[in-house]
Every structure is written in C-alpha cells, then in structure tokens.
C-alpha cells in the first residue's frame, strides 16, 4: 500500500507519540518526553499555530512524521515506525520539512546521535557540517541549493 505524505492535523498527535515511543534508536518514553516539555498538548499547540509537521499515512494510519521549529530553522523530529522503515518514508518526510524550512531560511540544522543510523541517513540526504555538541550528539546543517 502506498503512503501519503500530508500536513499533520491536531487529531494526529496521539499517533505521532505512538510513532515516537516505538522507535529503537533514540528511544524516549512519554515521561521522558514530558520532562523535556514535549507533551501532546504542546505538540498540538504547535500544529494548531502553524504548519510545522507532516505525517506519512498508510491506509488511514499515521506511520511516521517529521516536525520543524521554523523560528529556530531546525528539523525537530523525524521518525518512522520500525515496521515501516526502509520504504523511503523517512526521506519523504524530511524533504517535506526541508522544503518548508527553506522557504524562510538559507541554512537549517538538526541534532542527532553521532554513531547512529539516523546520522548516516541525514548525511545521505545532503546534511553535513558536523559539529560535536557534547555527549554523543552532533549538529548537522544543510544549505538551500
């Protein structure tokens, strides 16, 4: 079944959290996310305020999402259910987020783990300019082409 990429709706928020806590790499629980200020209410408020998230939908089920912080010029999140990884959904979600960010910014950034599959994935999409930000994390950047 083909996936559709569309802007996220407030009603998608519980599904976004289901996807977020399902991942194996960079796993965080709902409680850990809440300690960082990332709650369903906060994410719903962000989505209601401006177009800042996209979902990959298979059938009627969201199976992945990406989210940006436009003010910060950052790709805030990009996650796909483990059962749907390797199908190009992450690439499509990141490209949708990049397109929106590049409407207002010449350079965008994200943070991820240094030795993760995600870091390699982002590099394959043209992200670079690696900067060590401590612990095991790096910041990658991408310029509008």
Predicted regions and their residues:
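Conserved acetyl-CoA-binding loop-helix of GNAT-fold acetyltransferases
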Residues: 86-99, 124
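A short helix-loop-beta-strand connector motif used in the catalytic cores of GNAT acetyltransferases and
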Residues: 44-55, 74
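Residue-level recognition of the GNAT/N-acetyltransferase active site
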Residues: 81-85, 113
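Conserved beta-strand in the GNAT
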Residues: 55, 61-69, 74-79
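A short beta-loop-alpha structural element at the N-terminal edge
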Residues: 4-18
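Conserved active-site alpha-helix within GNAT-family acetyltransferase domains
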Residues: 91, 114-132
């Amino acid at each position: 079944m083909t996936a559709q990429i569309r802007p996220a709706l407030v009603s998608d928020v519980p599904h976004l959290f289901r996807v977020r806590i399902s991942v194996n790499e960079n796993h965080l629980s709902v409680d850990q996310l809440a300690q960082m200020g990332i709650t369903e209410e906060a994410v719903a408020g962000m989505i209601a305020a401006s177009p800042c998230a996209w979902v990959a939908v298979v059938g009627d089920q969201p199976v992945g999402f990406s989210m940006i912080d436009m003010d910060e010029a950052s790709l805030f999140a990009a996650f796909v259910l483990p059962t749907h990884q390797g199908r190009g959904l992450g690439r499509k979600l990141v490209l949708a987020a990049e397109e929106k960010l590049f409407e207002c910014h010449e350079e965008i950034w994200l943070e991820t783990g240094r030795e993760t599959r995600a870091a390699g994935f982002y590099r394959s999409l043209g992200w670079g300019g690696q900067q060590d930000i401590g612990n095991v994390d790096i910041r990658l950047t991408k310029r509008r082409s």
